């Protein structure tokens, strides 16, 4: 009985150790992933008022980000992310 208890404890500890080495459960939250179409439509209206680019009806184009615009889903803390995101200068 004592051997099976020790074996169980070793298995639990190894499971915790190797489980913590795996991929993180929560992925990095990117601004734009959780916006609804109402927010996107509001942005499109604001950009349309300024004469800039208008966002597609689905919201797959560019959004205002800080001083300019950037690809939808790439704006974080009023800055466009660098990797895999196109940046556009404001007009």
From Swiss-Prot:
Contains 3 disulfide bonds. Residues 22-50 form a propeptide. The keyword Ribosomal protein does not apply. Expressed by the venom duct. It is found in: Secreted. One of its GO terms (molecular function) is toxin activity. Residues 1-21 form the signal peptide. The keyword Signal applies. Keywords: Disulfide bond, Secreted, Signal, Toxin. One of its GO terms (cellular component) is extracellular region. Belongs to the teretoxin M (TM) superfamily. The cysteine framework is VI/VII (C-C-CC-C-C). This is Teretoxin Tan6.2.
């Amino acid at each position: 009985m004592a051997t099976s208890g020790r074996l169980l404890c070793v298995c639990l500890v190894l499971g915790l150790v190797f489980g913590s080495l795996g991929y993180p459960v929560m992925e990095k939250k990117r601004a734009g992933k959780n916006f609804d179409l109402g927010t996107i439509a509001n942005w499109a209206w604001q950009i349309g008022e300024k004469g800039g680019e208008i966002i597609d009806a689905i919201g797959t184009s560019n959004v205002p980000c800080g001083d300019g615009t950037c690809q939808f889903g790439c704006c974080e803390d009023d800055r466009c992310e660098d990797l895999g995101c196109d940046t556009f200068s404001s007009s």
